[in-house]
């Protein structure tokens, strides 16, 4: 009965057109804004960064996170969970303890920087949780459905554990972080404490920027701590990072097993890219409207290397330059000015001279989400 009560506390799972519609974000836009003064148009121009068109990646991430949360909730307040609470208390007291409840789920979401991983995850979590904390009456408890933390830059195990406690306090108004700092808890004590907190109050834990473990001597220790947390709490853990983190997890079997998941590259020149470019180009704040041509679309792809955040930056900065310079036109001239003046540090990564459009534009690919990270 308890498991059913927890599951019904989250919104029903969506799919198909209903899911795409729920994920989509189209900022309000009125063409008459092009006749307003420059200051007003420049301020409204930032709405481009709010645009979000769900892609195949968005759908897959939503489904993966929803099912992982569901699996985690189904293990809470069972007889095994109660036994695990006693073991975690022993860990806090620095006594011998063991993991009884077992791991729920551990997976990765890996993709190049700028393809929209974090935004896709944020949109999915917002839809899955409704931005609400789960409350259960008997026995009374509160659960954060999805908790997102960042991997410390130095891969500090203690830093990550304290950050989890701090984020839980933000949602629940508790004092776990304050108490841990007051007693100067050791890492071993913190693992027991965080396991207990996760068992009682966390559904799904998302650890972003996991690539920080790659070049740190504490990297394997941090992944080991996450594994121990999974086994002692039964919650699902999602690790998000760039492709370099995949090389780290491939080093050993125990790491590879914990990093099974989904991977994405830059966007293909396909129907989705064309649709996204068309929608993005409809948000024009310059006085003279420009029609999106196949030539401009190809230019955008070649000068972004299929990285969606770069596409948005190009169109945004080109309009900003056009307004400030008085050119008032979004065309190849202003787009090229934006590329040369604003994106110079990315030239070595984009290389438009050798980035060519694939012959076929009809093959379906796992395209990334559409907004910058």
Task: Give the predicted meaning of each segment.
Residues 127-139, 170-173:
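Post-Walker A helix-loop "phosphate-sensing" segment adjacent to the P-loop in P-loop NTPases
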Residues 97-122:
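Walker A/P-loop nucleotide-binding motif
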Residues 194, 214, 224-295:
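The catalytic "switch" region of P-loop NTPases
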Residues 1-34, 45-48, 52, 199, ...:
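C-terminal alpha-helical "lid" subdomain
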Residues 133-152:
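Conserved catalytic segments around the Walker B and adjacent sensor/switch elements
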